[in-house]
Amino acid sequence: MKRLLLLAILLSSLMPRYMAQTLDIYFVNAPKSVLPLLDRTARLDLMDLYASGLPAKAENLYGGQSELLEKTSDYLMLKTSDAGTWQLKVLTAGHDTLLVCIQSVEADGVSSRISVYQNDWKMVKRDMPHLTNEKFVKNSTEVTDFDRQRLMPTLLHLPIQATWHADEPVITFCLSLDSLPKEYINLAKELTKNISYKWQSGKFVAQP
């Protein structure tokens, strides 16, 4: 299986840029600047193990374990390390293909960074949803004014986490509550909301 995939990757290098490629090929061809922890051999091993229904784990370049958690025809989620994940979503915009990556790191909460590339892994500038912490705060009759005032300064400084939906071109943002004391988490959930956008006709559209 690995030989067949490697052959497909080699053949893809001979194809014109506009021709369709598979998510597997994009993943394997991602440059070191995009995915530094895994070399090509490790990536091929991960996909081979995943396709075989086995735990898709491989040693990364830092000596730790990386794991391929989920893969569809246009989505991939990788646990790069104990504190990091990397997601890839393949989007279409007319005749163009965009590769949108979410790099998330856990340190006092989960913080995400989004990068957009052409199908040859050249970075491009695209209008991505720009969200401030205030937009995640909602009114709630379940939280007293005292608790709201007490939590607000903390909510406004929490990191923002982003996640792709595996089965549709939807990205969801939320405030990462992992760093909050346990007694505050339920209150924070009552005071905050998730915000989702769907990729439609070459742009992100806010979802109700």
Spans of model-derived segments:
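Acidic/hydrophobic-patterned starts of short beta strands in beta-sheet-rich repeat architectures
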Residues: 94-104, 166-174
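Short aromatic loop motif centered on NTY/YTY
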Residues: 127-198, 208
